[in-house]
């Protein structure tokens, strides 16, 4: 696919239409607040309140987490936007949308970076991430093209950033319920499905389950699945003030994890299930799991993989770093043959989704952590 910043300008008719719409909007002189009221707002921005005195900043360098009003110039891979409620809203050329800047790491989709200016960029994720795509999976269509119209700011001219609406920071509690972590070999290895199944199994025991996604790209799907599976309280890194966690400092990843776990404890959780995005070799995931913090934060881990070899190597990698590996799971358990291979070579019990949903299996896993 072609990843040029001006690809959306190649259609002269579309360019003229966009100019005409912009001219009519200019004549009507809507306030920024009125434009924001009509704009389609992304799920990533759900915690930020807009006042009537909101303004737009131009000629500034965006930062990760900054909110931006942008115009859709060409539809591509993402032709829908998840709104604050999680509904997938259809997009049209000329729409104004409110999204958050953020880096994106998604091997099955895009790698995208926050640009150094407010020039043309892309909708890098359906949850509402503005960034400039620098690499794409060959299966992807062209990214949806955006023109930023300005960063959102308050009456004092201070930019609105997700960090300003975050949960209060917390340290990792000294006394807390057990925390299970779902890890994986890669993106799309079955982590989220396994996490949801474990939540279901623990809930069927009568436990109050809290769930969190501590790294990844802001979107509604995974948290909604956790809640549907029985979690009483669900949080993610957006609640901790980040649109995405790609390229975030390691200290920030630890702070996000501690804050989310602490707030789930305060909500009265009997047990907590945490998902860490992507695979063991991804930058932030690897740093987190190689740090001593992860041993204090996670009492037991389950590892998801798409095949037996990945499961065996992942379990070994985690054990070498001192983690309490409770089971291997993931996509490979959907195939009886792959599951059989994993059972032969993996130094951990192999548990499929249907087993993790069982209160008997959930009770057995619960008994193997503090």
What role is predicted for each listed range?
Residues 83-85, 116, 120, 204-208, ...:
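Charge-biased, low-complexity intrinsically disordered regions
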Residues 92, 97-103, 108-111, 115-179:
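Extreme N-terminal, non-catalytic leader segments
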Residues 124-163, 225, 250-266, 271, ...:
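Conserved catalytic-core segment of NTP-binding enzymes
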Residues 163-217:
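Walker A (P-loop) phosphate-binding motif
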Residues 75-77, 184-190, 305-307:
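Short, glycine-rich nucleotide/cofactor-binding loops
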Residues 1-121, 126:
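N-terminal accessory targeting/assembly segments
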Residues 200-244, 251, 316-320, 336-346:
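N-terminal phosphate/diphosphate-binding loop that engages ATP/GTP or pyrophosphate donors
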């Amino acid at each position: 696919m072609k990843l040029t910043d001006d690809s959306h300008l190649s259609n002269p008719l579309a360019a003229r239409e966009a100019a005409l719409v912009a001219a009519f909007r200019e004549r009507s002189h809507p306030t920024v607040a009125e434009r924001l009221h009509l704009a389609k707002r992304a799920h990533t921005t759900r915690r930020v309140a807009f006042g009537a005195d909101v303004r737009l900043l131009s000629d500034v360098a965006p930062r990760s987490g900054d909110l931006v009003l942008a115009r859709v110039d060409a539809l591509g891979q993402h032709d829908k936007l998840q709104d604050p409620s999680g509904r997938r809203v259809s997009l049209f050329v000329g729409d104004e949308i409110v999204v958050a800047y953020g880096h994106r790491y998604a091997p099955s989709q895009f790698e995208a970076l926050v640009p150094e200016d407010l020039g043309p960029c892309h909708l890098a994720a359906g949850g509402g991430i503005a960034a400039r795509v620098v690499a794409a999976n060959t299966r992807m269509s062209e990214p949806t093209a955006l023109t930023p119209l300005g960063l959102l700011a308050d009456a004092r001219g201070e930019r609105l950033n997700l960090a300003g609406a975050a949960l209060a920071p917390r340290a990792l509690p000294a006394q807390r319920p057990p925390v299970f972590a779902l890890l994986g070999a890669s993106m799309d290895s079955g982590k989220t499905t396994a996490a949801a199944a474990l939540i279901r199994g623990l809930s069927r025991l009568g436990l109050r389950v809290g769930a969190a996604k501590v790294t990844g790209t802001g979107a509604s799907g995974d948290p909604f699945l956790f809640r549907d599976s029985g979690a009483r309280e669900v949080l993610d890194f957006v609640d901790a003030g980040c649109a995405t966690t790609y390229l975030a400092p390691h200290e920030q990843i630890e702070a996000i994890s501690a804050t989310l776990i602490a707030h789930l404890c305060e909500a009265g959780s009997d047990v907590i299930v945490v998902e860490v995005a992507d695979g063991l070799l991804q930058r932030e995931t690897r740093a987190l799991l190689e740090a001593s913090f992860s041993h204090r934060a996670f009492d037991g881990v389950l590892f998801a993989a798409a095949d037996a070899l990945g499961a065996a190597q992942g379990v070994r990698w985690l054990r070498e770093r001192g983690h309490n590996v409770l089971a291997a799971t993931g996509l490979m358990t959907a195939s009886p043959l792959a599951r059989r291979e994993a059972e032969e070579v993996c130094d951990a019990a192999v548990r499929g989704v249907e087993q993790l949903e069982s209160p008997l299996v959930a009770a057995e896993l619960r008994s193997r952590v503090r």
